[in-house]
């Protein structure tokens, strides 16, 4: 696929999704059955309406059956499914019905709350509709087919995805809102996080714990002793996920994260990628100065490369109250971020250090334990 975007001055090639791969393989199967000839490439219309020519990596056919595979090409976006083969088997039937299922390496939904019913193959609604429409268009109105999508590497590749968090077990998902993979785009990642949040809400939860990543998850479960069932990753998308909690009408949010990540939010930085915004030292220095810290401490903290290193100096100087001040500012900034939209969301914050453990919380920890048990 020769389509490009530019990001930070660099040129990146776009790719296509697992859903587009499955639709292309399905079309190749139908064409081989109807023509009794091998097909090396097919034209498909993606879920977003883009017409692509997709190479077919594997072909096998007989009078009423065919198998085809398309190799997933994510362009310059090297995700968990890049390079794997997506297979489709098609068997023609005597009735006019076209049915679709997933086989080996395609996950199955085991929990309510996502767009796939419990027990069904993890083929999302948009690619499902596209695969069925592609086959129907190629096959005509009067013939039927059984379509099986499978991916021999799927179970292993799925370990690198968020599927297990969503209750999708046994393989990858067939995805693709537009059918196109855009390199350096965070949209797919954010959508996955939103799906997990929606699943929790649909299961009846009205309060949620947001963590930036594994450190936060581990601290919530093993230090605070809270249930893992309330935890959802927000990654670097703090603002986006806060807006999502409001959209989904969660009543309470508890943000738990390493101080070096959450400190940015106290200054209104709601996307915490270090490449986009890093003001950790500046925020610490400003707040220490407001507490009356000596110039020597401010200068030393400013030179620190990490908040862990700064923490050692802050502790030695006796200014650990700065953590409580900043935790309250994280809470205030976050609630102000959601202030002008309804419904209101109550937010609390817990920050920690890998070396020093709990640093600060906006409520007494025992009170939080009672609220979140």
Curated annotation (Swiss-Prot):
Q: Which SUPFAM superfamilies match?
A: CbiD-like
Q: Which UniProt keywords apply?
A: Cobalamin biosynthesis, Methyltransferase, S-adenosyl-L-methionine, Transferase
What Pfam families would the database entry show?
A: CbiD
**An example Gene Ontology molecular-function term:** cobalt-precorrin-5B C1-methyltransferase activity
Has UniProt tagged this entry with the keyword S-adenosyl-L-methionine? yes
Keyword Methyltransferase included in the entry's annotation: yes
The protein's name is: Cobalt-precorrin-5B C(1)-methyltransferase
Source organism:
Listeria monocytogenes serovar 1/2a (strain ATCC BAA-679 / EGD-e)
């Amino acid at each position: 696929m020769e389509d490009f975007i530019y990001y930070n001055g660099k040129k990146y090639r776009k790719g296509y999704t697992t859903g587009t791969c499955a639709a292309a393989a399905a079309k190749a199967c139908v064409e081989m059955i109807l023509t009794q000839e091998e097909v090396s490439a097919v034209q498909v219309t993606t879920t977003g309406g883009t017409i692509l020519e997709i190479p077919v990596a594997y072909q096998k056919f007989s009078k009423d059956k065919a198998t085809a595979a398309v190799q997933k090409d994510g362009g310059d976006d090297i995700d968990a499914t890049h390079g794997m083969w997506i297979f489709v088997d098609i068997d023609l039937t005597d009735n006019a019905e076209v049915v679709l299922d997933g086989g080996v390496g395609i996950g199955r939904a085991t929990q309510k709350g996502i767009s796939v019913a419990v027990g069904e193959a993890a083929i999302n609604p948009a690619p499902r509709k596209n695969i069925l429409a592609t086959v129907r268009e190629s096959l005509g109105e009067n013939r039927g087919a059984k379509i099986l999508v499978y991916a021999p590497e799927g179970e292993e590749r799925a370990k690198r995805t968020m599927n297990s968090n969503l209750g999708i077990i046994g393989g990858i998902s067939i995805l693709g809102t537009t059918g196109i993979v855009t390199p350096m785009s965070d949209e797919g990642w954010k959508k996955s996080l939103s799906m997990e949040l929606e699943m929790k809400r649909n299961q009846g939860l009205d309060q949620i714990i947001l963590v930036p990543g594994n450190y936060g998850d581990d601290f919530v479960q093993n230090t605070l002793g809270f249930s893992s069932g309330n935890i959802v990753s927000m990654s670097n998308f703090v603002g986006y996920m806060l807006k999502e909690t409001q959209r989904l009408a969660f009543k309470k949010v508890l943000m738990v994260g390493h101080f070096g990540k959450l400190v940015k939010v106290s200054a209104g930085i709601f996307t915490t990628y270090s490449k986009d915004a890093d003001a950790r030292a500046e925020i610490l220095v400003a707040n220490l100065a407001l507490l009356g810290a000596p110039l020597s401490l401010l200068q030393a903290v400013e030179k620190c490369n990490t908040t862990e290193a700064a923490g050692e100096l802050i502790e030695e100087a006796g200014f650990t109250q700065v953590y409580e001040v900043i935790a309250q500012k994280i809470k205030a900034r976050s609630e102000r971020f959601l202030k002008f939209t309804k419904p209101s969301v109550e937010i609390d914050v817990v920050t920690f250090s890998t070396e020093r453990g709990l640093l600060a919380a906006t409520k007494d920890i025992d009170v939080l334990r009672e609220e979140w048990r």
